């Protein structure tokens, strides 16, 4: 269950991601710096954490998506390895072409930091098998550019193929179709704006994020 948490300059949720990974998946999970050109041998899950990589210069995730480690992340995904991108990590995945669409400024142009409710739209992915279809989760968000956009054809394809896995119950940012998280065609790459790593312990107010890691653990064990 080897897990690698990628660190970019400006990442600020990397410690949270590492803690959640060690707590739920891999006690030996570790960091990988963005200048590395290879993942640790045996890596099964790559975790792209939230933050403000490279200070969000140009666009959120734009520079991080072109950092040296991302070639290895792309190759890992192409081999069927699991990739989880949260918040800025989701932005990096879209910029890198691993997921379609883009994340733009929130509808009200304000930074939003609060617990939100999500509905599980697809409980048949490797990331969501621990949930029930339609289950409502409480997971926090913390972003200023979480407004998901894609062209109409892409949105229609995502919906038709069941690749919208999480949807906001009360849309906080203007995302088209209330989209909070999507997977790639193969189903091994998940990008989402809410922070499941901040919802793995009751002490933090919610354990609803644990299902993602439990689902992955089940997939990795198989």
Curated annotation (Swiss-Prot):
Major subcellular location class: cytoplasm
GO terms, molecular function: ATP binding; glutaminase activity; phosphoribosylformylglycinamidine synthase activity
Biological or metabolic pathway of the protein: Purine metabolism; IMP biosynthesis via de novo pathway; 5-amino-1-(5-phospho-D-ribosyl)imidazole from N(2)-formyl-N(1)-(5-phospho-D-ribosyl)glycinamide: step 1/2
Pfam families documented for this protein: GATase_5
Keyword Hydrolase tagged: yes
Reaction(s) catalysed by this chain's protein: N(2)-formyl-N(1)-(5-phospho-beta-D-ribosyl)glycinamide + L-glutamine + ATP + H2O = 2-formamido-N(1)-(5-O-phospho-beta-D-ribosyl)acetamidine + L-glutamate + ADP + phosphate + H(+); L-glutamine + H2O = L-glutamate + NH4(+)
Residues the record marks as active site: 87 (nucleophile), 195, 197
InterPro entries: Class_I_gatase-like, PRibForGlyAmidine_synth_PurQ
Coiled-coil regions, chain positions: none
Places the protein is found: Cytoplasm
GO CC annotation terms, alphabetical: cytoplasm
Alphabetical GO biological process terms: 'de novo' IMP biosynthetic process
Glutamine amidotransferase type-1 domain ranges (all copies): 2-222
UniProt-listed Enzyme Commission number(s): 6.3.5.3, 3.5.1.2
Statement: the UniProt record of this protein carries the keyword ATP-binding: yes
Keywords: ATP-binding, Cytoplasm, Glutamine amidotransferase, Hydrolase, Ligase, Nucleotide-binding, Purine biosynthesis
Function: Part of the phosphoribosylformylglycinamidine synthase complex involved in the purines biosynthetic pathway. Catalyzes the ATP-dependent conversion of formylglycinamide ribonucleotide (FGAR) and glutamine to yield formylglycinamidine ribonucleotide (FGAM) and glutamate. The FGAM synthase complex is composed of three subunits. PurQ produces an ammonia molecule by converting glutamine to glutamate. PurL transfers the ammonia molecule to FGAR to form FGAM in an ATP-dependent manner.
Quaternary state and interactors: Part of the FGAM synthase complex composed of 1 PurL, 1 PurQ and 2 PurS subunits.
Name of the protein: Phosphoribosylformylglycinamidine synthase subunit PurQ
């Amino acid at each position: 269950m080897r897990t690698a948490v990628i660190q970019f300059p400006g990442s600020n949720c990397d410690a949270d991601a590492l803690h959640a990974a060690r707590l739920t998946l891999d006690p030996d999970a570790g960091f990988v710096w963005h200048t590395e050109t290879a993942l640790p041998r045996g890596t099964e899950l790559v975790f792209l954490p939230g933050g403000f990589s490279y200070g969000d210069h140009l666009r959120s995730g734009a520079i991080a998506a072109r950092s040296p480690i991302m070639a290895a992340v792309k190759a890992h995904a192409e081999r069927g390895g699991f990739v989880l991108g949260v918040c800025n990590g989701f932005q990096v995945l879209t910029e890198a072409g691993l997921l379609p669409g883009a994340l733009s400024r929130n509808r009200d142009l304000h930074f939003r930091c609060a617990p939100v409710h999500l509905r599980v739209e697809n409980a048949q992915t490797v990331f969501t098998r621990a949930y029930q279809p339609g289950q409502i989760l409480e997971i926090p968000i913390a972003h200023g550019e979480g407004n998901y956009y894609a062209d109409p054809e892409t949105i229609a394809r995502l919906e038709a193929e069941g690749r919208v896995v999480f949807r906001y119950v009360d849309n906080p940012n203007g995302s088209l179709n209330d989209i909070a998280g999507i997977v790639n065609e193969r189903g091994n790459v998940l990008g989402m704006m809410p922070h499941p790593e901040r919802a793995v312990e009751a002490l933090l107010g919610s354990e609803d994020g644990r299902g993602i890691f439990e689902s992955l653990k089940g997939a990795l064990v198989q």
